[in-house]
Amino acid sequence: MKKLTLVLFGMLFLASSAHAARIKDVAKVAGVRSNQLVGYGLVTGLPGTGETTPFTDQTFNAMLQNFGIQLPPGTKPKTKNVAAVIVTAELPAFSKQGQEVDVTVSSIGSAKSLRGGTLLQTFLKGLDGQVYAVAQGNLVVSGFSAQGNDGSKLVGNNPNVGIISSGATVEQEIPTPFGRGDYITFNLIQSDFTTAQRLADAVNNFLGPQMASAVDATSVKVRAPREISQRVAFLSAIENIEFDPAEGSAKIIVNSRTGTIVVGKHVRLKAAAVTHGGMTVAIKENLNVSQPNAFSGGQTVVVPDSDIEVTEADGKMFKFEPGLTLDDLVRAVNEVGAAPSDLMAILQALKQAGAIEGQLIII
């Protein structure tokens, strides 16, 4: 049987943080982000692996007209060394004119391969329709494609996508709100009210009272210098402040394809019993009373005492010590050689019955 993999996180978001984290590792400055660019262009110089489509021919004719070449009316160039492509790039924050960025080139027609091609000058536009970069250069394609006369074909990786390292030159800068206003806002990568408040407290302890405040579960506003020249040093100091983020919420993440199970520290099970096929999983909870000695000053308290049993049709039984967690359940199911699908069904049934204290996420 395929074994189930259990992963207990002690340092990630599903469990408590064992070490302090820097602000720059858990939050981003609002407005300081990369921007996606896209353009439409032509790749030429292909060794017979191009295409002949209406939009490719139209683009090819428009390119010739830009160079002053006018084809006779009704002429349809049958070129197999040209391909229409979409060019994409990501423009980092604070990119300046003249800097270069990588581009990805993808065929949108029936071209067999872009290997050996050259991208002609292509304008890359942002969401607002303005041109922010211009791309051109020779493609690097890791894939390959070969076809025999009898129709047999061999393809490795993806020959219709290539990259051009430093293939686009930035022509226009994208403005950011970095230098505007009296405040700088930090947005948490993972929203959490407690983490937001702790971040604000850490900044106030470093800068002084009332310098930072949590707006909501995601954003923390920090009063910043008005002089732009001072904000770089200010942010450099702020983003390296260390603090203790809040413990993550109780979650169970199950990858049904690999059988991997990620269990948060705070996940607990209530009393329940599940029968799945020939396997039975039983959870029992007893409430014991702890009585202090006379005149000791102690208090009478109720102490939960939990046990779990897993049995199969052949009579196998597994017993566990009190103090039940989902870790015990997973190990018990693993002992009887259950497939990942068995545990998926058990976890879903327990969640539907309200026996799991936490979120169940199946990916």
Swiss-Prot record:
Q: Name one GO cellular component term.
A: bacterial-type flagellum basal body, distal rod, P ring
**How far does the signal peptide extend, from start to end residue?**
1-20
Q: What is its main location?
A: periplasm
Q: Which cell locations does it reside in?
A: Periplasm; Bacterial flagellum basal body
Q: Which GO terms describe its biological process?
A: bacterial-type flagellum-dependent cell motility
User: Keyword set for this entry?
Assistant: Bacterial flagellum, Periplasm, Signal
From the UniProt record, which GO molecular function terms apply?
Answer: structural molecule activity
Q: Mind telling me which residue stretches traverse the membrane in this protein?
A: none
**What is known about its subunit structure?**
The basal body constitutes a major portion of the flagellar organelle and consists of four rings (L,P,S, and M) mounted on a central rod.
Protein family according to the UniProt entry: Belongs to the FlgI family.
Its job: Assembles around the rod to form the L-ring and probably protects the motor/basal body from shearing forces during rotation.
> Protein name, please?
Flagellar P-ring protein
Its source organism is: Vibrio atlanticus (strain LGP32) (Vibrio splendidus (strain Mel32))
